[in-house]
């Protein structure tokens, strides 16, 4: 057993471990592992902090986006209301304009009708006077007839024009 290679490898390994332990190698390894564990823990804490910060930024972004969408909807609704109000005002103005134009046209037509009616009456009165004058001249002779015709024609003419 003392002459086998495995025995001497085991003895060398145990001797190596004793030397490492005496020199403080184990404490160096544990301190190295502890510092590595601290560094990993620190990196995990940093990653957790960054993740929370990113989540806060994402929540803020979502909140701002919803606010912007609400504001855009409010702007669109306001613009739609303004457009409807302006269209209604335009229709009202157009209807008022058409009503005024119609009323003015009707007034002009009524005035033209009244003027035409007056002209027709005047023409009818003149024609009636001339016809009456012609008939009376043919049937009546003398100065008295002339005076009677003139008085009657003036009376008829004034009544027809009134």
Curated annotation (Swiss-Prot):
Keyword Phosphoprotein belongs to the record: no
CDD domains: ATP-synt_Fo_b
Subcellular location: Cell inner membrane
Bilayer topology term: Single-pass membrane protein
InterPro entries: ATP_synth_b/b'su_bac/chlpt, ATP_synthase_B_chain
GO CC annotations on file: plasma membrane; proton-transporting ATP synthase complex
PANTHER family referenced in this protein's UniProt entry, alphabetically: ATP SYNTHASE SUBUNIT B, ATP SYNTHASE SUBUNIT B', CHLOROPLASTIC
Functional note: F(1)F(0) ATP synthase produces ATP from ADP in the presence of a proton or sodium gradient. F-type ATPases consist of two structural domains, F(1) containing the extramembraneous catalytic core and F(0) containing the membrane proton channel, linked together by a central stalk and a peripheral stalk. During catalysis, ATP synthesis in the catalytic domain of F(1) is coupled via a rotary mechanism of the central stalk subunits to proton translocation. Component of the F(0) channel, it forms part of the peripheral stalk, linking F(1) to F(0).
Protein name: ATP synthase subunit b 1
